[in-house]
Amino acid sequence: MEIKRKVVCTSTGCIEYAPERYRQLGIDIIRIHVLFKGKEYLEGLDLDPDAFYKELETLEDPKNNLPRTAMPTEEEIKACFDRAYEEGCKEVIVIALSAYLGGTWNLIRLVSEQYKDKMTIH
């Protein structure tokens, strides 16, 4: 019997540069939040790279106005795992930045504990 698997990547994995490819392969994305100029964006979804870089070039006080990132929410991670489970997946392989570079991996690991009776999350 074949085990159905799903690959999940955080948007920090640069996979967003080939969206047609990750969609074709069935890879899901857990998106990082970008905070910039008083607005919040989901990386790779509602933040156009060209517009973003143009905005960076015109910052009046770059030292104090640089963009910041924030982790995805627990609900966003659960929604991703729920979709995988509903698709019949028994295993999920998550590709994310190191736990030493931010809190996203640790949050993913904590959320994955809630699914240990349903599927294996690596």
Language model: regions and residue ranges:
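N-terminal glycine-rich anion-binding loop in soluble enzyme alpha/beta folds
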Residues: 4-76
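Glycine-rich phosphate/diphosphate-binding loops that line cofactor/substrate pockets in enzymes
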Residues: 1, 78-90
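Residues at the starts of beta-strands that form the adenosine-phosphate
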Residues: 4, 91, 118
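Short, contiguous clusters of charged residues that form electrostatic/catalytic patches at enzyme active sites
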Residues: 75-79, 106
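Short, intrinsically disordered, charge-balanced linker/junction segments flanking boundaries
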Residues: 116-122
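Short glycine-rich or small-residue beta-strand-to-loop segments that form or flank ligand, phosphate
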Residues: 91-98, 122
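Short Gly/Thr/Asp-enriched flexible loops that form oxyanion-binding sites at enzyme active sites
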Residues: 96-116
